[in-house]
A protein has these predicted regions:
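Short, glycine/acidic-enriched loop or turn micro-motifs at the edges of active sites
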Residues: 100, 131, 210
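Mid-to-C-terminal alpha-helical segments outside catalytic/metal-binding sites
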Residues: 219-260
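Short helix-capping segments at alpha-helix termini
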Residues: 53-55, 147-151, 196-198, 227-233
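Short, charged, surface-exposed secondary-structure boundary motifs
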Residues: 30-32, 184-191, 212-214
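Catalytic pocket-lining loop regions of alpha/beta-barrel enzymes
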Residues: 112-196, 201-203
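Mid-domain alpha/beta scaffold segments of enzyme catalytic cores
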Residues: 1-121, 127, 139-140, 144, ...
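Short acidic/histidine-rich active-site segments
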Residues: 197-215, 235
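Short, acidic/turn-prone active-site loops that include or flank metal/cofactor-
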Residues: 24-27, 179-184, 208-209
Length: 260
């Protein structure tokens, strides 16, 4: 939410959102110094949580070197020398976003190092699947996880589309679906995926970044699912129970399954 205005928090609160998880993100312009990353990590673990709390929203976050910035291998490696300090913050519920952007060897190096750190720290992992060559990037991520003999039930494979959901789901990962006005899923497409694959290990999220994006994508998807006849139990599982179950692996989520 660092790229969004305060009005967005108000709109989210009015729409009934009471908690969110903000993944570590790029800043539009590539960062050039390790200290810029560290200041950003402080921002989303401190100030952003305070900003959300003013609207009654519980703010969690994930910490990681985003794959968009992993190709500056020297800088990314320097950032990783201190990143574990932020893993200990009470609002940090996962390591991420990690993964591939351009699908390079340097990105894989940084991915592997952060996966090792995350599992050592006992934190789950949020994986970014790339905008371009999405299936190739997803398959390479799965290969890395399997090569490292890591438990996929501790990993969220995010930004799935119709192209990737089968391999993500069949390999035992939690499956995120980003509803985004231009480049990712619409509420209708997300609902169609849930209809085909069911609610187990499924989640839906929004994107609140520098381009066209909508912080109300989740309630809009809920509205679409209700119109299409999904039961309240299925909707609740996808947008509430499943995220709580996944992020509770961290031991830091103080929310309960179910809603009134």
């Amino acid at each position: 939410m660092i790229s969004r205005i305060t009005d967005d928090y108000e709109k989210m609160a009015v729409a009934g959102i009471v908690a969110l998880t903000e993944p570590s993100f790029w800043l539009g312009e590539p960062r050039k110094h390790a200290g810029t990353f560290y200041d950003y990590f402080d921002h989303i673990t401190n100030f952003e949580a305070q900003r959300a709390a003013e609207y009654g929203i519980k703010h969690y976050c994930t910490i990681g070197v985003n794959p968009r910035e992993a190709n500056d291998i020297d800088l990314a490696t320097e950032v990783l020398t201190r990143i574990e300090e932020w893993f200990e913050r009470p609002s940090v519920v996962a390591v991420g976003e990690l993964g591939f952007d351009l699908i390079t060897d340097d990105e894989e190096t940084i991915l592997r190092r952060q996966l090792e750190m995350a599992f050592s720290a006992g934190l789950p992992v949020m994986i970014h699947t790339p905008h371009r060559n999405k299936l190739e990037g997803t398959m390479r991520t799965i290969k890395v996880v399997q090569d490292m003999d890591l438990d996929p039930s501790r990993i969220l494979m995010d930004h799935n589309t119709e192209e990737t959901i089968e391999v993500s789901h069949d390999n035992g990962f939690w499956c995120g679906h980003t509803v985004y006005p231009v480049t990712k899923l619409s509420p209708e497409r997300a609902a169609a995926i849930f209809e085909k694959y069911g609610p187990d290990r499924m989640m839906v999220n929004s994107s609140c970044d520098w381009g066209p994006s909508d912080p109300l994508s989740v309630p809009r998807t809920v509205w679409r699912m209700r119109r299409e006849g999904f039961s309240e139990d299925v909707i609740r599982k996808i947008v509430w129970d499943n995220p709580i179950a996944f992020y509770s692996i961290s031991g830091r989520v103080d929310l309960q399954p179910g809603w009134e």
